[in-house]
């Protein structure tokens, strides 16, 4: 099983003994990590080798998510007001904004800079845009990022997901 929700990982691991076949849990934390792990599956490799390679692939993914605050809240001492744009890095709120485009580009830029400072390269950025965003909106984000990161392969996918304006995979 490729689990992408950290709240479900423990339950999935506890269910292993109940299965009527051999089951392994790959504890991914975000949708892009799960997708990348699945894409690295090799039908010719054994289970252990696949677990190693799929885990390695998932661990190389940074995830940016842009959504909105559904209510007033306080996260880590930061006041968040209902309706504000939220920037999440690997599931954690790292900023707020009033403009979706600005929040998205700034978030990706910060993640790319952090990856480069820590020795992780950036070869691919995949922009998955949600039901509230048009293809033209996503193209503007892509174009802004392409202007900053020449040589990085940037693709767009209409994910149609609710709640998140953008889910972005950076690897």
Name what the model sees in each region:
Residues 79-102, 107-144, 167-171:
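Glycine-rich phosphate/diphosphate-binding loops and the adjacent beta-loop-alpha structural elements
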């Amino acid at each position: 099983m490729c689990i992408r929700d950290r709240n479900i990982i423990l339950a999935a691991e506890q269910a292993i003994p109940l299965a009527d076949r051999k089951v392994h849990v790959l504890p991914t934390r975000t949708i892009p990590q799960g997708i990348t792990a699945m894409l690295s599956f090799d039908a010719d490799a054994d289970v252990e080798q696949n677990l190693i390679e799929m885990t390695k692939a998932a661990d190389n993914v940074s995830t940016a998510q842009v959504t909105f605050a559904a209510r007033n809240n306080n996260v880590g001492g930061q006041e968040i007001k209902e309706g504000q744009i939220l920037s999440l890095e690997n599931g954690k709120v790292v900023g707020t904004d009033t403009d979706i485009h600005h929040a998205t580009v700034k978030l990706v830029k910060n993640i790319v800079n952090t990856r480069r400072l820590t020795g992780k390269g950036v070869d691919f950025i995949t922009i998955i845009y949600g039901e509230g965003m048009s293809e033209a909106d996503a193209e503007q984000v892509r174009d802004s990022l392409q202007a900053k990161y020449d040589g990085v392969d940037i693709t767009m996918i209409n994910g149609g997901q609710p709640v998140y304006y953008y889910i972005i995979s950076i690897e």
